[in-house]
């Protein structure tokens, strides 16, 4: 019995040490900002820096679907969800049901400025002083 406890303790201890020695996962996913080559850099170095900087900016600003922290947003009935009230006229999916547009889309029947005033209360179910 004591041998089993020792083995379990050693397994737990080795697992903890292995986890502590790993680099943090966030550091592996974040790209490093390219280093400026200086004012006396050759055109090739500046072109390489510009390409690396463009790649860096694209990595930082790319859309991350499902990866955002949604503390301040709703997980349901967001503006532009299939449950919002703006149908796409004439466009139907395979099941024959209407597709829906994002709030304020250029193809929607209501101008964008109307959505900036009314989209959030409608999505929250609080339109006209409701719930």
UniProtKB/Swiss-Prot annotation:
It comes from the Eukaryota. One of its GO terms (molecular function) is neuropeptide hormone activity. InterPro entries: Pancreatic_hormone-like, Pancreatic_hormone-like_CS. Its main location: secreted. One of its GO terms (cellular component) is extracellular space. PANTHER family: NEUROPEPTIDE Y/PANCREATIC HORMONE/PEPTIDE YY, PANCREATIC POLYPEPTIDE PROHORMONE. This is Pancreatic polypeptide prohormone. It comes from Bos taurus (Bovine). The gene is PPY.
